Amino acid sequence: MDDFRAGVAVVGVALLLSGCTGSPEPGVVSPSPTASASAAASGADPWDGPVTADVDVVAQELPVPWGMAQLPGDRFLVTMRDDATLAVVHPSGDVEPVDGSEGPQQLVDQTVADGEGGLLGVAVEPEDSGPLFTVFLYRTGERDNAVLRAELDLDGMGLRDLTTILDGIPRSSNHNGGRIAFGPDGYLYVATGDAGDPANAQDPESLGGKILRITPDGEPAPGNPDPGSPVWSMGHRNVQGLGWDPSGRMFASEFGQDRLDELNVIEPGANYGWPDVEGPGESAGDQAGFRDPVVWWPTSEASPSGIAVTEEGVYLASLRGERLWRVPLLGGPSAVADGESPGFGEPHALLEGEFGRLRAVRAGSAGELYVLTNNTDGRGEPMIEDGRPVDDRLLRLGLTPVE
């Protein structure tokens, strides 16, 4: 189980924290030292350092929420893992269940909530403006995990034409992956886990332990490393966060086993080493051509699930770590304007211990962040106010650089 792991790593940190041992600390490697050095030296961008967050509670008493996709008007389509239901959460805090048409019952009938499995990721076709939206869902069934497509009608709060577009993804009570997201190229990316069998991650014929790239019809997307395969990258243990920065660079968060959790920059066809390598700088990984993470944490401090990537940072919602990690993107927009990929600043934590387990994070339309807590999933402790539980909640964060 990813966030009930024992053991604390002694981390040997490369480059920025080279040579430090003894106390568990996050580590950082910058793949763009020129951009990093120039941004850090100038001191011109206050977002290169830590930020603080003002927090508002938008909605509460959500039953085991897992994924969320943004709709126009700062509304969010949220999946409930165990109930296999969908709801639209409005900025006012109103929560409307999606219970019209035949789709919701079909979704319940074919979803199996088993441990970490159930109704997981959700994505909305980015070109849709409503009231009809094409939505994509990742669910655990009796035999496999699958990606589904359906039509969402916000006027009638209905779901219809539920269709399986990709199946055969290994399933288990643990390590199901589940995050799905549209990339800037217009294709759908699917994060899968090794389903408790590490060999899946290194098997090119298995869809487990991979990041997949498909068309909206579920076919391998044009330009994939193997034209006949949906596999985009491999060697993953359990990816649950996907995002892209303004330079088009792709990021993924990944659960480690008992040493190190990871933030990776994803390249097509690359192998990220699981189960041979966990974390950075291992000679076996270097010799085998595995890719190192760009940032890593002891598992006690992270267990990263969803991520959000903005112009100024990568944000990781952490379960066992009960905090929101921020990795600054040094120089942000100015680095991109100069044709550089921003480097990485020192990771720092927000919301540490304040709201418990954090499952997902999304960027809003006005620079704010939205964060889903996850204390009702059987591993957390729901918060009680006035004698009744208030978890789980959708939080809105306003961010300000620390002067």
Predicted feature locations:
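Acidic, Gly/Ser/Thr-rich repeat motifs that build Ca2+-stabilized beta-propeller blades
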Residues: 21-197, 241, 249-256, 301-336, ...
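Sec-dependent N-terminal signal peptides
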Residues: 8-14
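Surface-exposed loop and turn segments in beta-propeller and other repeat-based domains
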Residues: 96-114, 162-176, 216-233, 271-299, ...
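Bacterial N-terminal signal peptides that target proteins for export
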Residues: 1-8
